[in-house]
């Protein structure tokens, strides 16, 4: 089955994983509605709620080993990412009930973000697309899969700072962290090796690697990314000016930043990335410190999505 095409699966049994903390508790309500919809349509449902991400992943792997027609996750991009660690490279489809703050996976595949029952219908209808995933391998050979974007540089420094903060909660924490990092803005010495042949050595503000187009709740950081082309879209920004960087951010909402002089883009299947003291974040979560190898893995996941649109 080639990537990008749809085919139909019979969905009779679903393993449902919920992150009760997603969307400030909205995931629990969304999961109840989605699971009720599945049962109404005659689907058997096995419910999983992990105590933490590691526990949830362990429980999901055990449930998948017993046999299931699909996995349905309710929450944000973090719970989707957790499921990817189990489902990558298998033929078990992933269904998503969006209930987080970002929902970038859901946005990529045209899923309803405010209607859990409609999203559940998409799971039962059984139409899947074969898509690529991103894979990060650190210096110790430990792998992490991702679906959307792997971020390094300024945006990963913002995540580092936000994770250290106890207050405030929600998006305001990230805005404050961003302002704090802007005050410390400095060029970062990156070394990238694309597909083992092309070397880029440059002082960059950020370098992001997209399997899909958006991160951070709709920021089109890699606006031309294609989740079924077997390649990562790479966006690099060079700016030691706070004013220029502040001007850049509004353009990311529409993907227009790629037209700016200080932004360059390219594509590769595999990228070796080095930058001292910088971490990688993927699907919004910490992945590993650099250096790391970031790759596109073709046809690594079956995702349930609307048949049309």
Swiss-Prot record:
Keywords: ATP-binding, Cell wall, Kinase, Lipid biosynthesis, Lipid metabolism, Magnesium, Metal-binding, Nucleotide-binding, Phospholipid biosynthesis, Phospholipid metabolism, Secreted, Transferase
Stretches assigned to the DAGKc domain: 9-140
Coiled-coil region: none
Cofactor needs: Mg(2+)
Active site: 285
GO cellular component term, pick one: extracellular region
Cofactor mode of binding and number, as noted: Binds 1 Mg(2+) ion per subunit. This ion appears to have a structural role and is required for catalytic activity.
Example GO biological process: phospholipid biosynthetic process
EC category name: transferase
Residues bound to ATP: 19-23, 76-82, 101
Sequence positions that bind Mg(2+): 226, 229, 231
Cellular location(s): Secreted, Cell wall
Reactions it catalyzes: a 1,2-diacyl-sn-glycerol + ATP = a 1,2-diacyl-sn-glycero-3-phosphate + ADP + H(+); N-hexadecanoylsphing-4-enine + ATP = N-(hexadecanoyl)-sphing-4-enine-1-phosphate + ADP + H(+)
Single GO term (MF): ATP-dependent diacylglycerol kinase activity
EC numbers: 2.7.1.107
Mutant lacking the gene: phenotype: Cells lacking this gene exhibit a disruption of the production of certain higher-order phosphatidylinositol mannosides (PIMs) species.
Free-text function comment from the UniProt entry: Catalyzes the phosphorylation of diacylglycerol (DAG) into phosphatidic acid. Is involved in the biosynthesis of phosphatidylinositol mannosides (PIMs), probably via a role in the biosynthesis of phosphatidylinositol (PI), a PIM precursor, which is derived from phosphatidic acid. Is also able to phosphorylate other various amphipathic lipids of host and bacterial origin in vitro, such as ceramide.
Family: Belongs to the diacylglycerol/lipid kinase family.
The name this protein goes by in its record: Diacylglycerol kinase
Upper classification of the organism: Bacteria, Bacillati, Actinomycetota, Actinomycetes, Mycobacteriales
